Amino acid sequence: MFLITFSKAGQEDIVLTEDDLFDFQYEASCYSGESFELGGVNAKTLYLLIDNNTQRFSRGTFANCRVKLEIDGKFFGYYNTELPKRRNGVIELTAYDDMVKLDTEFPTDYTFPQTFWAVYAQCVFEAGLASEVSFDNVVLNGVWDNGIISADYTQYIYANSCRNLVAGMAEWNGGFAYINDVNKLQIDKFSKTVTREYSSGDLMELDYSDETVVFSKVKTSQKNKTYEMGTDAGYTLVLKNQYISYGLDDTMFETYLTKISEYYTVFELTPMSFTLAEPDFDLHVGDRIQVYDEEEQVAITGNVSKIAISGNCSMTVTCGGFENVSSSSGFTPTSYSQIQQSKQEAKGDGTAEKLQTTGSK
């Protein structure tokens, strides 16, 4: 069951359920494409088609609202609405979590050197996610925590948004960033420990690559020089966020790169996509999972890169890998957006059926 609460100053809260919706899409992810990468700063997305055939919701009702999402009694975060669209008795609405608030300028009068933690906390404050600069507003669970940005090359820092800085630091912490359930900025590494096991009998659909990605090298650049650690035996994990590396002195640069190399060398993952017969709402992006294919009698392992929940409470899970792996093995990636599909279908004749949450627990 969906419970969606809209709050706005000067207006009583509006609570919608699946009975009020023609469509529902939720998506959480930790990187944008199908290729495994560090430094993701993706916002969770909520997409709704609201039934307004009786014109019960006047213009402006859902504009600039704060949205609370609950599914089967579990809290799924707060969201900020974009301007809704109306047509044929339907209100189309997209909302994003507070990660989008980090799309604000970083202050140019900020002085360095500073620790990563201090810069994270400053970004949270600048974005309006906290009333003061405090380490308590940031949760670090990276390959290693913290780090130091020197006073050198800070013009690259000032030229970026807070979100870009968070992405760069999260990459060098060996993980990805997101807004957690208590609305704090959190940086997590990709887990090496399997926390969920499924068999193909638990799944409605299962597609996976014939090849497993095994990292054997980490590669990056700093000040027009390329640095590599590892061998050519497997795949290369590339750190791309150079404006953070510019701010690292040579000793720290090598130390941080070594820590990431030690963690991700021999890190294995198999690109896959599956739909659960029963949703698992305790599964999170970044979790390491294992799926046993009963027909092929093989176990495949990967890290969750995207979770999508649709209107009937079906839950599709994607574990990314590398684009060249997926294209060479016949793996069908799930980059096709269910949200875009819903938008196209909604632009038909305006006739649609209400949601049925038959798949929920």
Identify the function of each model-found stretch.
Residues 1-13, 88, 92-96, 102-111, ...:
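Acidic, low-complexity/disordered segments
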Residues 1-111, 122, 153-158, 166-174, ...:
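Assembly/oligomerization scaffold segments
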Residues 29-33, 66-68, 72-73, 77, ...:
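Glycine-centered flexibility motif
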Residues 35-40, 258-260, 318:
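Short secondary-structure boundary/capping segments within folded domains
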Residues 85-210, 355:
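Charged- and aromatic-enriched interaction segments used to assemble
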